[in-house]
Amino acid sequence: MEEKKTIIWAGFDVGKETFSASLDKITESGKAKITSLPCRDFKRNPEGVTKFFQWADGFVSEKELHIVMETTGCYSQQLTDWLNLSHPEVKVSIENARNIHAFIDSLNLPHKTDKLDAQAIARFGTERQPHPTKRPSKTILTIRELSRERTALIKARVELQNRRDTITSSVVRKINAQTIATLTIQIKKIEKEIKACIVENEEILAEVHIMTTMPGVSFVSAYNILAEIGSLKQYSAKELSAISGLAPRIRQSGSSVHSSFMSRRSSGRLRQILYLDSVAGVPKIPVLQDFQQRLLAKGKKKMMVRCACMRKMLLMLRSMVIHNRAFDENFLKFSQTSFDL
């Protein structure tokens, strides 16, 4: 029988310029004290990644290395790219910052430093054994960055437009108009880049095309959904409900049973998109209309019903993409078993 390799967990505390790395493993004598774990700082660049692996080689030897870090937006994503490029065989887990912070709080550490955080994150990996993170494709990451920049520019333009009627100075009014015009040009340029990215990728193009056949889901909504969570094909129905933050969270303690609420453990942008799509789409989709009326008849609150429809709508999109078929308002009536809702 093949002997199972010992896994060494590397905990990364990632910053803008540097990252702190610590190594941990379970030995025959048990777990070492957290503050005694080896730790070192490296530059957050390709050279720093190379130096990390050179340093870690002295501890890893024949053992398997698994890296875990908390999500820090572009910093953790860029560092993961360098890690994969340097050592593609090494597994990397990017964990929800809330989970890691809760774990660190439970350790009751005396101080808060980058070194201690890296050591605690390494212990998090040893104890929790997180699964490797599914890395989005380069195209999805590019679309995500472009779509978020587009949203930021639109928000800035709306603020300027709302202020336009209150401006009394002719000079300021002229600057306001010029800035709005510049933002409009930049927004159109970003939209053109997004379309080019989608057209170049046949798989993403096909998925967007199928999603836009559902009432309420526009081209912008479709690519924003993909930008936030990637292809819908990669998730089960339960995983998709959880990653969207729309799964209900139950609160019960002893004889006290509190009302459930939305978990919200994911992208707020995704829920915003689904909310707007459901407002436009539910009245045009008989299945969701019936579902909405049944919940309202049971006395459910309107916002709770809206969230349930958002979740149902997302799962319908997933089923359409998996089965590669356009929206059909009657498809649930003759294909109940094919769609995992």
Locations of the language-model features?
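Gly/Thr-rich phosphate-binding beta-strand-loop-beta motif of the actin/hexokinase/Hsp70
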Residues: E2-E28, I121, L153, N224
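Short glycine-rich, Thr/Ser-proximal phosphate-binding strand/loop in the N-terminal lobe
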Residues: G15-E47
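Short, basic/hydrophobic alpha-helical segments
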Residues: P46-H66
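Acidic, metal-coordinating catalytic cores used for nucleic-acid/nucleotide bond scission
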Residues: V68-L79
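Phosphate-backbone recognition surface of nucleic-acid-processing proteins
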Residues: F219, I225-K298, K302, S338-L341
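Low-complexity, acidic/Ser/Thr- and charged residue-rich accessory regions of DNA metabolism proteins
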Residues: S255, Q292-R311, M316-L341
